[in-house]
Each structure stands twice: as structure tokens, then as C-alpha cells.
């Protein structure tokens, strides 16, 4: 026994010594999460790993082993997840789950007791207002109550849905939607009520209009009549009544007053017993006026006006301008009175006529979409009904037309102010001439007062007296002036068609209208004649320029005859040129007068040279019988320049000094025909071409005798025949064809106008043809000039070629120093 104890004690001491030796030999460099095996080796702790189980390298480290990923075979079970820890791992329940025991972790699937957590029960306020919490496996959701939706910025906050604006309501069209918090209602609109058996509010509500007028629910004033409308009502003035000042008609608060007779009194400053009696009768009608008797009052006023204009009495003794003022006052007042008294819808359609010719047509209708035509014996008016409707006034529309032929007595000699395209009368142009009134004076009015710029034109068809041929017809209206009087005007009115006894007018405003006739013949321009004039004069200018150059440069033909030709050509050249470029420059009166006087002088000078040409031709023919050239030459040279340029200058000076304002017309820079002023040109012209024609006839008679006395020598015969041909051509050159201008009357006027324009616009062509192209001496000179020109051109070309050849020829080389040495 004792030996065994001793043996055990010895073994224990041996082991204790070995352990002490090992402890002293443990390696001190082992890394974190490891332990030493001996003095030279280490081993990683459980849950960590290195490159080998036991390692001896001091640089080795121990890494944590992730037991939650392969190849580890850790399984935590359903609704849980493995969570790695330092050197170990845990199993935890998924969010929204918890262990039955309440513990937070477990180690393996056998310990898994994870179950769903009901968040809605744990926190009833988890979802905000108007939201409901719904538990789900491992989580929860918030759902909005009906009529609400989530706000985009906060998925837990619900906000109201406006079913009325979003269109998410089935309300009937007879209701209107009212949004509530989380809901809506379908309520009847104001002025509507639920149909029998229908609720008022739910989405199946159906409503019908309430007739406030028949049910007595309206609040219309006693001066108005209730008119039911869909969902409401309006209050309109009673027939013959009108809204009080500042209060619109057809409103719920409309208040009306009985219709007043429009104010119509004697115009100030006019002293006439006849007119005073008329307005006394008008005042009597005003005093006894009742709305119900509006039709009778209209008839009475028109009857009194008809009698006044049939026998104006002392009105005709008033000065013309006062008569025009009275007419303006009568037309204005008549229009206002008739418009005011015609608003009674019970009137309907009226047509009155009176002994002196006054006619009245009226139509009163509710709003219609059609044209209306009012016909009278002497006038017809056509327009669309929408022109008569006053903006914002649902009442009846009025269209009226009154024809007052007697008004023409007061409007006699009234002035006309027309637009430029219709300008036929100008005080400075046609003094004392006034347009003639052809038709009756008519006045048109509508219930709409704004008739100065109508949306569509009104058409008037006038019957009138026969129009004098070639007189212009104008559609005019009476325009009121600032002084209380007025004048005829054409602005806004156009003449669409005119015949002998009828005219169609179209106007964009309403007033008093009539048809006027110009007091003198108005000639319309023929575009064909204009083209012929400008083409003929342009060709004549070219020929006159060539002829003048020929007479100046051709020395062989220069004599008294060519001097006459040259002066005639220059005068016509300047006159035609001024005519082409300045005849229409009427915008400046002074400039136009200067142009007209210059044309007057140049054409008179040209005709004077034509007279001298005819005289010289006559003397030449006479001297074929008796030779006396020297005396002729001295006589011609001494007189021709003073006569040709002096006489026209005196004539123009006298005309300009006596009536300078008659130079220039509204359309042309020429002499005006008034007071015989145009005869300052026509008189000398007629005298000259008459003398020229007589001289030419005598010349031809002399030549005929000369031809009969000649022998048959060919050269003499040919020269004399050429002289005869030239003498005949002088009919065109010497202005004898200007008589065609005087013959422009009657049926042949158009033919004469064309002949006059063609022949006289080509006068320069005849001069160049007869005096240049048919002259043998001139033709010979043309040939010489042509040969000289060709020779000059050839020499120029040869000189050019010679200069070019010299430049192209190589120059001989000059020997240098090396050449000299050799």
C-alpha cells in the first residue's frame, strides 16, 4: 500500500516537471486567435483557420471561419437566417419573426421556434390617418380607406381623392358633384330639383329644371316679365318699356320704366314758322303718347313730316346752308324717334305710304338667322338679321326704312366730299358745279345703335330718274358735320351697278342715303388708248431725236427748210417727253400748273412751226412757177423765230396772268375746260390747222397744174411727184389730223378717238420718214456715215492687230561680256 502511494507520487512529480518544461518552451510569436503547440509551433483556435492546422511561420494569421456559407453545413431552419460571429455563429429569426421563448439567437435547426410577429397588434397607430394596417408574413402594409389615396412623398399617409375633378364619379348631367372628405355627393344644380322618386345627393340622383316663373319662386320686378331658362330665369322689360339708366335688361335685378317719347325739338338758330308748327304738333304727340299707341304715333309723325316737306313754306326762303342744317336735324330726329317707338314687339310688320311720296317699312322680329328685305316703290334694302341684333339684348330686333322724297328740296345744292377714286367735284376745279340728286332720300335704322362699322354690308337698290349719258353715278350718304349741318359723302359706300333708271349700292354703315349724278360728262380712260399713246409717243421720240441729229449734222441739206424741220422736231420732242414723264404729276398743284403751262407753250410753239412749214411749202410750190427764192429766204429768216416762239409765249402769258388756277386738272396736268380756258389752246390750234389745210389744198392745186405743164422728162417728173407725195404727207405732219379730236362726238366718237391717238402719236415717225428716209440727199449722207463708220472700225481693228503682232515678235539678243571676248 505504501509502495503504491510512493510510486504515484513519483509519477506526478515527473509529469509536473514535464509540464513546467513545456511551459517554459511555448512560442511567444503565435498570432491572435491561436495558441502555441510548443516552442516552435502554433495552432488556430476553434472557429478560425490558417494555411495548416499547425504552423511554424511567424507571419501566419488565423482567419475567422464563416460557418454560414458553404462548405459549412450549418442549417438554421425556416424563417431564420445564419449570422456569422467572431470565431462562431448564431441563428436568428427573420425580420417580422421571433422565437417562442423570446430569445434572440439559437444554434441549430432543432432549436428553431420562429413565428410571425403581428405588427398591427403591437402598434395600432403604425399607419397614419385614413389608413388601415394589414399584417403580412414577416411584415405589414397600410391601405387607404375608400375615397383616399397615398401621398407620393409618404406611403403611410392617405389624402382625400377629389372625385369631382378627377372624373371618378357617375353623377348625372343634371346634377353637379360636391366633394366631401373621403366621398362625394351628386346634388341638383341651382334652379333644379330631384325628379319624383329620386334622392338628392347619392350618385343615382337625377334632377329637372325648376320653372321659377310659374312656381312664383322668381324675384322679378313688377316692371318686368319673368322668362324661365334652363336652371334659372331672367327678367325682361315689358313690351314698350325700357331698362332704367345704368341697368341692363334681361337680368334678375332688371328694373324698367315706361317708354318715353324721344326728344325732338326745333333746331336752335332757325327761324321758320312752318317748322315751328311742325314741332308743335310733335310736342302734342309727345304729350299724349302711350306705349300701347306707338303704332298710331308713328303714323301721325310720318304724316306730319310728309305734309311739311310737300309744302315747306318759309323753309325754302332760308339760306342754303340753313336748309341743310334743318334737313340734318330732321333726319337725325326722325331716325331716333322711329327707332325708339318701334321697339314694341307687338308691331310686327308695318308698311305705310303718304300722299307726298313718303314711305315707311318696318319689321320687328325675335332673333332669327336669315336675310331681311324691305321693299318700297323707289327703294329696297337687303341685310342679315344679325346686324339688327343689339349685343347682349335678347329682345326683338328692329329693321326700318323710311323714304322721304321731299327731303330733296332741303338738300338741293348740298356739297359732296368724296374719296379720291370717286372724286368728280372739286371746288377749285369746277366752281359752281354741284352734283345732281337723282333718287329719293332714304333713312335706314336698326335696333342696334352701333351701325358705323357693320360686320356685313347692306345693299340698297334705288329707282331714280334717267341718267344723262356719260355722267358718273355715285352712291352717297348724308354725313353730319360738327356745325350741325352736313354734306354728301361716299366713304364706306360703293356703286355696284348702275343702269338708266336704277342703281345698286352697297354700304358698310347706316345713315341717310341717296344717288347723285356728276354735273358734267366723265370720261373713263380706255386702257388700249393709253397703251397706244405711250407706245406711239415713245417711237416718235426716237424718230424725232434721229431727225434732229440729221438736220444738225447733215451739211448738204441745211437750208431754211431744214431749219424749220429742226425747230418743229425739237418742240415736239420736248413736248412729247414732258407729256410722257409728267402729265400725271398732280400731287403738287403748283408743280402741276407749271407742267401744264409748259405743255401749253411747247405744243403751241410746235403748231406755230407747223404753220410756218405750211407757208414755206406753199411759197416753194408757187415759186415753181415764178422763181424768187432770195426774197422768200430773207422774209422767212427775218420772221420765223420771233413768230414761232413769241406768239405762243404771249398766249401762255395772257392765260397764266388771267386765270392761273385753271392750269392743272384733278387727273392731268393740263388746261381745265371751265370758263372756256381750254380755248387758249384749242383756238390757236383750230386756226392753225385750218390755215394749214387751206395752204396744202392750194399747194396741191399748184402742183397739179405744174405736173400737167411738164414734158415727159423722167427726172423732172419724178422730182415733182415726190414733192406732191410730200405735200400730201404734210396732212399728218402739219397737224391737220387734230381735227379728229373735235369730231369725237356721237356714235363715231370711239373710232375718231382711236384714229386721233394713232395718227398724232406717230407724228414724229412721219417727220423722220418724209424728211429723212425719203430724202435722197439724206440717204446719201447716211451711206457716207455708214462707210466712214465701217472704215473707222476696220482701221481700229487693223491697228489693234498690228499692235498685237509687234508685241508677239521676239527681240534680237544682245551679246554679253562673254560674247565680246569671243
Swiss-Prot record:
Cytoplasmic side: 552-562, 611-637, 698-728, 775-822
Site features described as Cleavage, chain residue numbers: 510-511
InterPro entries from the UniProt entry: EGF-like_Ca-bd_dom (IPR001881), EGF-like_dom (IPR000742), EGF-type_Asp/Asn_hydroxyl_site (IPR000152), EGF_Ca-bd_CS (IPR018097), GAIN_B (IPR057244), GAIN_dom_sf (IPR046338), GPCR_2-like_7TM (IPR017981), GPCR_2_ADGRE2_ADGRE5 (IPR003056)
Domain of life: Eukaryota
PTM entry text: Autoproteolytically cleaved into 2 subunits, an extracellular alpha subunit and a seven-transmembrane beta subunit.
Assembly notes: Forms a heterodimer, consisting of a large extracellular region non-covalently linked to a seven-transmembrane moiety. Interacts with chondroitin sulfate; the interaction with chondroitin sulfate is calcium-dependent. Interacts with CD55.
Protein name in UniProt: Adhesion G protein-coupled receptor E2
Source taxonomy: Eukaryota, Metazoa, Chordata, Craniata, Vertebrata
Amino acid at each position: 500500500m505504501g509502495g503504491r502511494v510512493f510510486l504515484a507520487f513519483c509519477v506526478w512529480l515527473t509529469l509536473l516537471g514535464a509540464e513546467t518544461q513545456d511551459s517554459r518552451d511555448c512560442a511567444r510569436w503565435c498570432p491572435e486567435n491561436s495558441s502555441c503547440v510548443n516552442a516552435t509551433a502554433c495552432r488556430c483556435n476553434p472557429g478560425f483557420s490558417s494555411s495548416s492546422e499547425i504552423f511554424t511561420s511567424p507571419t501566419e494569421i488565423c482567419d475567422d471561419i464563416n460557418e454560414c456559407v458553404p462548405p459549412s453545413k450549418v442549417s438554421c431552419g425556416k424563417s431564420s437566417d445564419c449570422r456569422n460571429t467572431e470565431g462562431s455563429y448564431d441563428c436568428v429569426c427573420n425580420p417580422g419573426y421571433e422565437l417562442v421563448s423570446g430569445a434572440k439567437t439559437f444554434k441549430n435547426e432543432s432549436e428553431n421556434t420562429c413565428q410571425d410577429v403581428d405588427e398591427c397588434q403591437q402598434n395600432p397607430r403604425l399607419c397614419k390617418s385614413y389608413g388601415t394596417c394589414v399584417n403580412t408574413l414577416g411584415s405589414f402594409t397600410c391601405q387607404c380607406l375608400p375615397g383616399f389615396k397615398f401621398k407620393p412623398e409618404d406611403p403611410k399617409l392617405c389624402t382625400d381623392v377629389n372625385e369631382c375633378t378627377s372624373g371618378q364619379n357617375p353623377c348625372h348631367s343634371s346634377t353637379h358633384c360636391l366633394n366631401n372628405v373621403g366621398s362625394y355627393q351628386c346634388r341638383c344644380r341651382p334652379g333644379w330639383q330631384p325628379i319624383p322618386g329620386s334622392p338628392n345627393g347619392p350618385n343615382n340622383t337625377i334632377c329637372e329644371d325648376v320653372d321659377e316663373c310659374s312656381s312664383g319662386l322668381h324675384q322679378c320686378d313688377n316692371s318686368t316679365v319673368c322668362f324661365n331658362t334652363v336652371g334659372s330665369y331672367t327678367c325682361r322689360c315689358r313690351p314698350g318699356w325700357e331698362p332704367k339708366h345704368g341697368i341692363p335688361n334681361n337680368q334678375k335685378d332688371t328694373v324698367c320704366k315706361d317708354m318715353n317719347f324721344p326728344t325732338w325739338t326745333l333746331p336752335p338758330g332757325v327761324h321758320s314758322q312752318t317748322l315751328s308748327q311742325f314741332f308743335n304738333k310733335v310736342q302734342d304727340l309727345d304729350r299724349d303718347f302711350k306705349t300701347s299707341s306707338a303704332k298710331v304715333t308713328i303714323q301721325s309723325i310720318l304724316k306730319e313730316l310728309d305734309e311739311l316737306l310737300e309744302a315747306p313754306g318759309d323753309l325754302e326762303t332760308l339760306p342754303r346752308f340753313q336748309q341743310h342744317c334743318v334737313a340734318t336735324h330732321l333726319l337725325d330726329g326722325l331716325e331716333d324717334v322711329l327707332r325708339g317707338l318701334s321697339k314694341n314687339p307687338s308691331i310686327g310688320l308695318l308698311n305705310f305710304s303718304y300722299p307726298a311720296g313718303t314711305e315707311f317699312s318696318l319689321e320687328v322680329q325675335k332673333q332669327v338667322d336669315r336675310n331681311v328685305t324691305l321693299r318700297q316703290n323707289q327703294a329696297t334694302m337687303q341685310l342679315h338679321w344679325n346686324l339688327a341684333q343689339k349685343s347682349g339684348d335678347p329682345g326683338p330686333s328692329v329693321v326700318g326704312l323710311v323714304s322721304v322724297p321731299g327731303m330733296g328740296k332741303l338738300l338741293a345744292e348740298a356739297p359732296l366730299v368724296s374719296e379720291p377714286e370717286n372724286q368728280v367735284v372739286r371746288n377749285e376745279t369746277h366752281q359752281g358745279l354741284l352734283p345732281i340728286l337723282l333718287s329719293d332720300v332714304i333713312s335706314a335704322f336698326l335696333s342696334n345703335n352701333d351701325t358705323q362699322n357693320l360686320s356685313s354690308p347692306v345693299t340698297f337698290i334705288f329707282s331714280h330718274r334717267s341718267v344723262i349719258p356719260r355722267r358718273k353715278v355715285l352712291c352717297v350718304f348724308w354725313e353730319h358735320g360738327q356745325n350741325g349741318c352736313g354734306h354728301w359723302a361716299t366713304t364706306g359706300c360703293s356703286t355696284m351697278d348702275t343702269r338708266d333708271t336704277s342703281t345698286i349700292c352697297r354700304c358698310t354703315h347706316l345713315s341717310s342715303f341717296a344717288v347723285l349724278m356728276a354735273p358734267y360728262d366723265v370720261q373713263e380712260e380706255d386702257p388700249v388708248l393709253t397703251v397706244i399713246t405711250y407706245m406711239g409717243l415713245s417711237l416718235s421720240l426716237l424718230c424725232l431725236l434721229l431727225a434732229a441729229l440729221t438736220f444738225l449734222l447733215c451739211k448738204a441739206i441745211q437750208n431754211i427748210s431744214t431749219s424749220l424741220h429742226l425747230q418743229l422736231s425739237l418742240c415736239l420732242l420736248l413736248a412729247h417727253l414732258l407729256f410722257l414723264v409728267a402729265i400725271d404729276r398732280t400731287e403738287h398743284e403748283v408743280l402741276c400748273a407749271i407742267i401744264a403751262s409748259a405743255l401749253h407753250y411747247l405744243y403751241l410753239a410746235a403748231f406755230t412751226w407747223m404753220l410756218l412749214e405750211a407757208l414755206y411749202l406753199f411759197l416753194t410750190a408757187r415759186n415753181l412757177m415764178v422763181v424768187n427764192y432770195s426774197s422768200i429766204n430773207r422774209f422767212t429768216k427775218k420772221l420765223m423765230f420771233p413768230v414761232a416762239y413769241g406768239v405762243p409765249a404771249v398766249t401762255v402769258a395772257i392765260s397764266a396772268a388771267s386765270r392761273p388756277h385753271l392750269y392743272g386738272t384733278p387727273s392731268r396736268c393740263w388746261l381745265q375746260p371751265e370758263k372756256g380756258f381750254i380755248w387758249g389752246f384749242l383756238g390757236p390750234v383750230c386756226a392753225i390747222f385750218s390755215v394749214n389745210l387751206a395752204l396744202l389744198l392750194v399747194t396741191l392745186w399748184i402742183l397739179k397744174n405744174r405736173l400737167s405743164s411738164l414734158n415727159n422728162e423722167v427726172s423732172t417728173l419724178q422730182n415733182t411727184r415726190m414733192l406732191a407725195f410730200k405735200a400730201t404727207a404734210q396732212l399728218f405732219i402739219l397737224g391737220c389730223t387734230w381735227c379728229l379730236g373735235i369730231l369725237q362726238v356721237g356714235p363715231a366718237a370711239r373710232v375718231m378717238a382711236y384714229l386721233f391717238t394713232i395718227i398724232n402719236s406717230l407724228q414724229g415717225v412721219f417727220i423722220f420718214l418724209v424728211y429723212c428716209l425719203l430724202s435722197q440727199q439724206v440717204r446719201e449722207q447716211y451711206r457716207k456715215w455708214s462707210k466712214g463708220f465701217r472704215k473707222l472700225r476696220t482701221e481700229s481693228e487693223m491697228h489693234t492687230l498690228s499692235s498685237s503682232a509687234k508685241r508677239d515678235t521676239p527681240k534680237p539678243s544682245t551679246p554679253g561680256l562673254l560674247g565680246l571676248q569671243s
